[in-house]
Amino acid sequence: MSLNAETKAAIVAEYAQCENDTGSPEVQVALLTAQINHLQGHFANHKHDHHSRRGLLRMVSRRRKLLDYLKGKNLDRYQDLIKRQGLRR
């Protein structure tokens, strides 16, 4: 239930700060958001899949921690990211 390589490459290319940037908070949050959105569609059909739901909650928690880190480091980048991602924070 992960993203395919083309989708990941497109997300990395869109949010990267420089050419080979895969570890910046923006890229990590964008990848986690795509995975979270993918899993939400999965739960529409599989309501009792508690094992995957736990993984979803871990991803949401990790994304929240990355967003809190970015908010403390650089508020402008944080606000730009939540606007581009459509997150309601």
From Swiss-Prot:
<keyword id="KW-0689">Ribosomal protein</keyword>
<dbReference type="Pfam" id="PF00312">
    <property type="entry name" value="Ribosomal_S15"/>
</dbReference>
<comment type="function">
    <text>One of the primary rRNA binding proteins, it binds directly to 16S rRNA where it helps nucleate assembly of the platform of the 30S subunit by binding and bridging several RNA helices of the 16S rRNA.</text>
</comment>
<keyword id="KW-0694">RNA-binding</keyword>
<dbReference type="GO" id="GO:0022627">
    <property type="term" value="C:cytosolic small ribosomal subunit"/>
</dbReference>
<dbReference type="InterPro" id="IPR000589">
    <property type="entry name" value="Ribosomal_uS15"/>
</dbReference>
<comment type="function">
    <text>Forms an intersubunit bridge (bridge B4) with the 23S rRNA of the 50S subunit in the ribosome.</text>
</comment>
<protein>
    <recommendedName>
        <fullName>Small ribosomal subunit protein uS15</fullName>
    </recommendedName>
</protein>
<keyword id="KW-0699">rRNA-binding</keyword>
<comment type="subunit">
    <text>Part of the 30S ribosomal subunit. Forms a bridge to the 50S subunit in the 70S ribosome, contacting the 23S rRNA.</text>
</comment>
<dbReference type="GO" id="GO:0003735">
    <property type="term" value="F:structural constituent of ribosome"/>
</dbReference>
<dbReference type="InterPro" id="IPR005290">
    <property type="entry name" value="Ribosomal_uS15_bac-type"/>
</dbReference>
<keyword id="KW-0687">Ribonucleoprotein</keyword>
<dbReference type="InterPro" id="IPR009068">
    <property type="entry name" value="uS15_NS1_RNA-bd_sf"/>
</dbReference>
<comment type="similarity">
    <text>Belongs to the universal ribosomal protein uS15 family.</text>
</comment>
<dbReference type="GO" id="GO:0006412">
    <property type="term" value="P:translation"/>
</dbReference>
<dbReference type="GO" id="GO:0019843">
    <property type="term" value="F:rRNA binding"/>
</dbReference>
